[in-house]
């Protein structure tokens, strides 16, 4: 299905988010969710879009009478681990109820020890790194599938098409290495290895040497594990250098942001998705989401904002199911009781020993006129 890609207005920025959940108001004091994410810099669109999706859901809940408010306190980390760690320490010292919607692997890894130490729920980070999932942590809940799930699907598709010479362009940090590990694992199961490797530094778009290295290897396809600005720069420069192969990107790249950066050069670029398409009106979650979007002046939809919307919806369901008054422990218990539950046709399932809610992954393809094919 080919559908128009829609965008969240940037005008909303990263303002505090108010919302509520479906239990009787116990007190007037809101529950505070702390979020450290990129709201400036080369990864800013990811933080902005996720936050706006969460805001969309929580605001519509807050409009209902008798609901206790939930406030998201945002702090900008610019997608830098040190800033994220400092933000997280500040949020914990301010006694936030939970940490929610962190953006990225290196930043989430910087925050995780602090969250674990103080037993603060860490819910729905925007990352699929295995290093955040293993070993199991009682207070950490992942909504999305892992990067290993994404790279397994990429390699399966590529090898099915007879494309076996695969190069990897990756960010030189924990995120990039998590993606590289996933590609290497999936290729190894096919008795294959990457034909070339090249890196880019986090928050940089200096890709000249990486393009030279990878184009020289003449791969059939390039798997990209980076943020949207660097990946877009690599695609443009590789094509200028004469490369005619296929580019595969992981979901973290940000589908809308990558397409915006590339314009007509987006044609044929592949992106794995861990959320259902927000543009497919046959999907009940997409219909609910886009109906909510239509009610907000100037708002529109994308994959990252849908993930924020669903993450807030799942967290609220955990609060609804929480035994007794809302506490950190009762939120954990409430989330663990979400067992094979449908959220508009998207299944989320947690348990006492499983805190990964979904394994859903599918492929999408960008077009040169701003659309997404799923």
Segments predicted by a language model, with ranges:
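C-terminal segment of N-terminal export signals and the immediately downstream linker at the start
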Residues: 1, 22-37
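Extracellular/periplasmic periplasmic-binding protein-like sensory domains
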Residues: 235-308, 370-373
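N-terminal export signals
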Residues: 7-26
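Segments of small-molecule ligand-sensing domains
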Residues: 295-305, 316-372
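Extracytoplasmic "Venus flytrap"
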Residues: 34-53, 75-82, 103-106, 169-177, ...
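Periplasmic-binding protein-like
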Residues: 91, 95-103, 123-125, 167-169, ...
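Beta-alpha junction/loop-to-helix N-cap segments that form part of ligand/metal-binding clefts
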Residues: 46-52, 60-131, 143, 200-207, ...
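Extracellular/periplasmic Venus flytrap/periplasmic-binding protein
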Residues: 86, 129-131, 138-242, 277-291
């Amino acid at each position: 299905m080919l559908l128009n890609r829609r965008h969240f207005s940037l005008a909303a920025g990263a303002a505090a988010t108010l919302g509520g959940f479906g239990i009787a108001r116990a007190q007037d004091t809101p529950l505070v969710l702390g979020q450290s994410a990129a709201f400036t810099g080369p990864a800013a669109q990811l933080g902005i879009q996720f936050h706006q999706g969460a805001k969309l859901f929580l605001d519509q809940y807050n409009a209902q009478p008798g609901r206790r408010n939930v406030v998201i306190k945002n702090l900008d980390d610019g997608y830098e681990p040190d800033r994220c760690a400092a933000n997280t320490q500040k949020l914990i010292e301010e006694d936030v109820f939970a940490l929610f919607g962190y953006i990225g692997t290196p930043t989430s890894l910087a925050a995780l020890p602090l969250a674990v130490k103080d037993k603060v729920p860490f819910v729905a980070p925007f990352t699929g790194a295995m290093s955040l999932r293993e070993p199991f942590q009682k207070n950490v809940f992942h909504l999305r599938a892992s990067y290993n799930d994404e790279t397994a699907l990429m390699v399966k598709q590529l090898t099915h098409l007879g494309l076996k010479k695969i190069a990897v362009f990756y960010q030189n940090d924990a995120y990039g290495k998590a993606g590289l590990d996933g590609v290497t694992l999936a290729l190894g199961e096919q008795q294959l290895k990457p034909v070339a490797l090249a890196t880019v530094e986090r928050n940089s778009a200096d890709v000249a040497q990486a393009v030279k290295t990878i184009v020289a290897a003449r791969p059939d396809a390039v798997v990209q594990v980076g943020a949207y600005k660097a990946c877009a720069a690599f695609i443009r420069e590789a094509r200028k250098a004469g490369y005619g192969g296929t580019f595969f990107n992981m979901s973290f790249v940000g589908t809308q942001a990558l397409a915006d950066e590339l314009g007509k050069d987006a044609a044929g670029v592949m992106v794995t998705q861990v959320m259902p398409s927000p543009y497919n009106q046959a999907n009940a979650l997409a219909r609910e989401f886009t109906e909510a979007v239509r009610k907000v002046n100037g708002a529109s939809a994308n994959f990252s904002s849908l993930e924020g919307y669903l993450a807030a919806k799942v967290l609220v369901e955990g609060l609804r199911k929480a035994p007794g008054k809302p506490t950190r422990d009762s939120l954990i218990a409430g989330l663990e009781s979400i067992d094979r539950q449908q959220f508009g046709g998207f299944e989320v399932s947690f348990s006492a020993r499983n805190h990964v809610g979904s394994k859903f992954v599918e492929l999408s393809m960008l077009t040169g006129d701003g659309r997404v094919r799923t």
